[in-house]
Amino acid sequence: MYSIAFMLVLRKMDEIISHTLAFQALVSLILLISITKWLSNSPKNKNSSPPSPRKLPILGNLLQLGSLPHHNLRSMARKHGPIMLLHLGSVRPVSSRRRPRGNHENSRSRLRRPRGSRSAALQLQGRVGGYGEYWRQLKTICVVQLLSNKRVQSFRSVREEETELLMKKIGDSSGNVNLSHMFTQLTNDVVCRSAIGRKYGAGDENGEKFLEILREFLELLGAISIGDFVPSLWWINRINGFDRRVDRIAKEMDEFLEKVIHERLENPAAKAEENFVDILLEIYRNNSAGVSIDRDSIKAIILDVFAAGTDTTAVVLEWAMTELLRHPEIMKKLQSEVRQVVKDKHNITDDDIEKMHYLKAVMKETMRFHTPIPLLVPRVARNDVEVMGYDVPVGTMVMINAWAIGRDPTSWDEPEKFRPERFLNSSVDFKGLDFELIPFGAGRRGCPGTTFPMATLEFTLANLMQKFDWELPHECRELDMSERPGVAIRRVIPLLAIGTKM
C-alpha cells in the first residue's frame, strides 16, 4: 500500500520536474533569442571589429606576413574578407585589399602617418612628416616648384641624353644584356642629375660610395624592425645590428646631402644644369615661395625624390619588359604603334608619346599587374571611423594592399592575365581618383610626383620598342617570375634579353 502510494508520489514529482525543466529550457531559449536580437540591434555592436586571423602569443600575425606580405595578406583576405584586423606584436593594423567605397573628401581628418618608427631616422622626416600647415606648404613647394608639368618638361634633355646612352650600350652589346642593371643605372642617373645636378657612376670614388649608400638606404626602407611591433623586444635590433645600420646610413646620407647643399651655397654659379637642390636653395635663401624652409627640410625632400624615383621607376621598366618578352604578340602590337607614329625619325618627341595610346595602356597594365610598391605607406586613424561596416578605432594603423586591389576580381575581368587592351576604352587612370588602380596612392597623401617618373617610363619604353627587336636568351625559354622582397618588388633573377638593332 505504502509502496504504491510512494510510487505515485515519485511519478507525480517526476512529471512536475519534467515540466519544470521543459519550462526552464523554454524560458532560457526565449531569453537567449531575445538577448541575441538585442545585441545584434545594439548600436554598440552594429559596427563590430573586422575579422582576425588566428595569431601567436606576443608575435601575433607577424610570421604569417612572410617575406612577401602582399601575397600572404591576399591569401588571408580570401578567408577572412577584404578587410581584416591583424595583430603584429603590440600593433593592431587594419588591412584592406579592396578599393574603398565612396569619396575621400574627409581623409585628411581621418588618417595621418604613423609616428615612432625606428626606420623614420632614415627618411630624416621627423620634423616634417606629420600632416599640418608646414607639411602642406612643403607639399605645395614640391608640386609647384619641382614636380609641375612645366618643371618636368624642363628636364627633358636629361631624359633624352640618358636614354640615348642606354640605347648605345644595348646597341654595342653583342649578346645578352642585363636589363635589370641597365634600368637601375638609367633611373639613378636621371634622378641624380635632376635632383642634385650631377650623376654618380662607376669609376668615380665618391659616386660609387653614394650609390652604395643609396642601395643600402633603399634596402633598409623595406626591412621590418621587430622593435616597431614588439617594443619589449627592442634589444633584438641591437643584437642583429639593425639599429647600427640605420644610424650609420642615416648619418652617411645626411653628410652626403649636407655636402651637396654646402657646395651649392658656396659656389652657386658652378651649377651645370637646373636641379631640385638649386631650386630649393633659392627658396631657402630668398623665401621666394612665401614659406621658410630649413636645410633639414631640403634634405628630406631630396631624399624623398631618391626613395620614390629610383628603385620604383626601374622596377616598372623591368616588369614591363618582362611581360612583353612573355607575350610577344603584345610586344609586336606595341612596336607597330611606336614605329608607325615615329615613322623615319630617329628621335621620339613628347608629341609622339601622346599619340601612343597602346604604350600608355601597357604602362597602366604593368602597374596594375606588378604594383611597384604593393603595400602603400601605412596611415593611422585620427579618430573613430567606420570602414565597410566595421569599427576602426582611433590609433589603428591602416594598411592598403594596392597590389591586391589591382587584382581584385570584383573590379577587373580576368585580373590574373596581363592584358593592356582593358585600358584602351577605359577612363581608369592611376592618378589617385580611380580607387581600383592606386600604384601611387590616393587622396591628399598620394604621390604628388607621378608626372616625373611617367615621363621617364614612357620615353624609355618607346625607345626600346622603336630601336630594337627583342627576344629571350636561347638558353632561357621561360622566365622565372619570382619576386624579391623590398619596398619596391623586383625580380629575384635579373632580366636578361637580346636586343637586335632595327
Curated annotation (Swiss-Prot):
Topological category with respect to the lipid bilayer: Single-pass membrane protein
Membrane spanning residue stretches: 16-36
Organism (species): Mentha piperita
Family annotation (CDD domains): CYP71-like
Gene name as annotated: CYP71A8
EC number, UniProt record: 1.14.-.-
GO molecular function, one term: heme binding
UniProt keyword annotations, A-Z: Heme, Iron, Membrane, Metal-binding, Monooxygenase, Oxidoreductase, Transmembrane, Transmembrane helix
Origin: domain of life: Eukaryota
Family as reported in the entry's similarity comment: Belongs to the cytochrome P450 family.
The protein, known as: Cytochrome P450 71A8
Cellular localisation: Membrane
Keyword Oxidoreductase in record: yes
Top-level class of the enzyme under EC nomenclature: oxidoreductase
